[in-house]
Regions:
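Conserved alpha/beta enzyme-core scaffold
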Residues: 1-307
Length: 307
């Protein structure tokens, strides 16, 4: 039976030259990351692999250049300087293709650092708000180190992992990282109203993160029977669900359900997701598969872009 151990003991499983996966976005396991970075002087050539992550990424600090090198599929705020300085590499790849890199051994993983809910009475933990590529990583990595946190929502879908699969567990009661909704400007609200006018009743929405997708969601109050099939989602969907605007009833794939790979938002969002059968957190290879997406009606993608 897998047992709980201190972070330092769990991260002693990481050796020089290993490839280590870090879970995505707000599920990035900060205690495990900190314990790994504490061992920087003992390690050389550890490759860190991840998508977008929130929070600290101290392994790419200049003083750890010989110990760690990051290979990232998304360049977020905590990776930009490192990529520009050569302490991290950007791997251009569609997110839907990343699970295949793990499963086919193209990018084999030695260790996966995960952030999960406590096990249920059957021994299953949940990847919670970040299933996306974490499902494939947890299937393929030789060593799974899990930060077990009662604040992690237990979500329905592909994110269940039995404790027998975990190599080491670390207890944690830290608040999850949050991305709080920001007040929208008059211009953003105007853009949101314009885009919302292009969305048809019964449409299936995909939306990104940022002010414009948030502004569009805020302007959908008069719509009906909307559905969600999206890589990620945030707080903007909650009110629309509670007001009966997002129902998913017109969707052909998982009708009635919100389908996503990961979520980033406030504590309110995480509580909304907890044990909510309406929300299906699924493997991103499936969520972002165009053959799946096109089966839904009136698919409408809402994202931000740089001019």
């Amino acid at each position: 039976m897998t047992r709980y151990v201190p972070p330092q003991e769990a991260l002693s499983l990481v050796r020089s030259g290993m490839r280590v996966f870090v879970q995505t976005a707000a599920a990035a396991p900060q205690r495990l990351i900190a314990a790994m970075v504490e061992r920087a002087s003992e390690l050389r050539g550890v490759e860190i692999v991840h998508m977008h992550t929130e929070g600290s990424a101290a392994y790419v600090d200049p003083q750890h250049r010989d110990s760690f090198h990051a290979s990232v599929m998304f360049v977020g705020h905590n990776m930009r300087d490192a990529v520009n300085d050569g302490r991290a590499d950007y791997i251009p790849v569609f997110l839907s293709e990343v699970p295949r890199l793990f499963r086919k051994g193209i990018l084999p993983l030695d260790v996966a650092l995960l952030h999960v809910s406590p096990p249920d009475r059957h021994g299953f933990c949940s990847l919670g708000i970040s299933v996306d590529v974490g499902r494939a990583a947890s299937d393929c990595a030789r060593i799974l180190i899990a930060q077990v946190n009662p604040n992690m929502p237990r979500t329905h879908g592909d994110g269940l992992i039995h404790v027998s699969r975990l190599t080491a567990m670390v207890e944690c009661n830290d608040p999850l990282l949050e991305a709080l909704p920001k007040p929208l400007s008059a211009l953003e609200r105007s853009i949101g109203r314009h885009v919302a006018g292009l969305v048809e009743d019964g449409a299936t929405l995909q939306m990104g993160i940022g002010a414009i997708p948030d502004a569009v969601l805020a302007a959908l109050g008069s719509h009906r029977r909307l559905g969600i099939h999206t890589e990620m989602f945030s707080d903007g969907v909650i009110d629309l669900v509670e007001r009966g605007i997002i129902t998913g009833e017109c969707k052909k794939v998982h009708p009635g359900a919100i389908v996503a790979g990961f979520a980033v938002g406030s504590r309110r969002l995480y509580d909304f997701m907890d044990d909510n059968p309406m929300i299906k957190m699924l493997d991103i290879a499936y969520v972002n598969d165009t053959d799946v997406i096109r089966r839904n009606p009136q698919v409408t993608a809402i994202n931000s872009a740089l001019e």
